[in-house]
């Protein structure tokens, strides 16, 4: 369950308001109760990039505990946006961690959204400290795997990859993407 997707199609509220629903106990309870008996439900998707939105670090874990109390048969997952913003705090207790890496079609040095430079210390270019190649996904997965091992959480937290490409001109032109992903991005290791 992705808290930003389910209500988005049933509501006229802005996405940023809807996507924070995972912090609302009543909303989470209603949504879990409405779908928990489905045989095709694999996993609950708690927070969509809570680190990038600076949600309270305890919010994803609180949602996961609530979800597990309502449906103990399915795990919850968490999708992180940032490379290293309060990683330990956000990931604590997460059964499935999904790094959200969008390397293709970005400008890794300058944010067109915020009109600011992106460095290792600051800035949001859509992919923290990426160079704009498909290997950024592999590198982030390896880095998160190593962090989980160092923390001793590698046996309790599974990594799932969520590479994404966007073809909508509306999305590409209004976000961090300078262009949509191409076949070459998927087939070449050196495409920027």
Task: Describe these PLM feature segments.
Residues 1-192:
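Glycan-processing catalytic domains of CAZymes
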